[in-house]
Amino acid sequence: MKALSKLKAEEGIWMTDVPQPELGHNDIMIKIRKTAICGTDVHIYNWDEWSQKTIPVPMVVGHEYVGEVVAIGQEVKGFTVGDRVSGEGHITCGHCRNCRGGRTHLCRNTTGVGVNRPGSFAEYLVIPAFNAFKIPDNISDELASIFDPFGNAVHTALSFDLVGEDVLVSGAGPIGIMAAAVCKHVGARHVVITDVNEYRLDLARKMGVTRAVNVSKENLNDVMAELGMTEGFDVGLEMSGAPPAFRTLLNAMNHGGRIAMLGIPPSDMSIDWNQVIFKGLFIKGIYGREMFETWYKMAALIQSGLDLTPIITHRFTIDQFQQGFDAMRSGQSGKVVLSWD
């Protein structure tokens, strides 16, 4: 079958032929319809320090997808051939304390689809049936293909009560923008997003944020005054991984504020811990999605009217994958979707 693979320990990604994956007793086989390019895939393409330490070569990459079930293992219940599914990209062990306690997103033995095992940039994908999620009929293939990153956004945004709260989102990448849109949809008052990339700030404006602030040109304190905010933000979502952005967020938080962190800093990061201590801030680390509460909330948010379509800015066939990666690497894109149909 055709697959996009990391074939060499250098920059790039290559289309190749690989054997069709084998189906286990508890697995389902998915014929891929659409895949989306993740920031992780860009890291793998660039062959940065993280990728060199993490990715075995060769490896079929990709973990954002939607497809159709075409085969089912003999022990599988709850799925039938023809079901339209996406799936949780974190494969968990099932026997550690967190798995057995129902906190599977905190499994210490997690492996990643398209990272540690063959991924979804292929004609067919095999995953444990436990990881599959049926897509409701009224949700499009395109939106379903970005459920993985949308789940990061939902998990981060819904970590705290948002109704009537003022929210600061640092980092206007696709996940940050989707998180901001979730906050507005569920009842936050002011949702302010910061970045230095004007293209993505414009995208955030299209998604309905209260203010999209280019911090290289505009002072956040002035924006807060403009909005009539006198005490700081109640909730902070750190989506950038940029130390200066996190420090700005800490400065802008109200006393007793709550912060969810999804962005991954490139190296050790120093902050003024006095801000955390004397403001009584609560900081929560976010990894992946809650299985499967986040997934049900994703579907419900879209069904209740949350419009994510503006976040998908580029569409290509799988044979145009290089154009897709070029768009993602340029920083002048939202989500990029590749069609296998």
Curated annotation (Swiss-Prot):
Top EC class for this record: oxidoreductase
Binding site for NAD(+): 175, 195, 200, 262-264, 286-287
Domain of life: Bacteria
PROSITE patterns: ADH_ZINC (PS00059)
Family matches, as Gene3D superfamilies: Medium-chain alcohol dehydrogenases, catalytic domain (3.90.180.10), NAD(P)-binding Rossmann-like Domain (3.40.50.720)
Binding annotation for Zn(2+) 1: 38, 63-64
InterPro entries per record: ADH-like_C, ADH-like_N, ADH_Zn_CS, GroES-like_sf, L-Threonine_3-DHase, NAD(P)-bd_dom_sf, PKS_ER, Zn_alcohol_dh
Entry keyword annotation includes Phosphoprotein: no
An annotated Gene Ontology molecular function: zinc ion binding
Single GO cellular component term: cytoplasm
Pathway listed: Amino-acid degradation; L-threonine degradation via oxydo-reductase pathway; glycine from L-threonine: step 1/2
Main subcellular localisation: cytoplasm
Catalysed reactions, semicolon-separated: L-threonine + NAD(+) = (2S)-2-amino-3-oxobutanoate + NADH + H(+)
EC id: 1.1.1.103
Cofactor details (free text): Binds 2 Zn(2+) ions per subunit.
Active site: 40 (charge relay system), 43 (charge relay system)
Record-linked SMART domains: PKS_ER
Family per record: Belongs to the zinc-containing alcohol dehydrogenase family.
Name listed for the protein in its UniProt record: L-threonine 3-dehydrogenase
Organism whose genome encodes this protein: Serratia proteamaculans (strain 568)
Lineage, uppermost ranks: Bacteria, Pseudomonadati, Pseudomonadota, Gammaproteobacteria, Enterobacterales
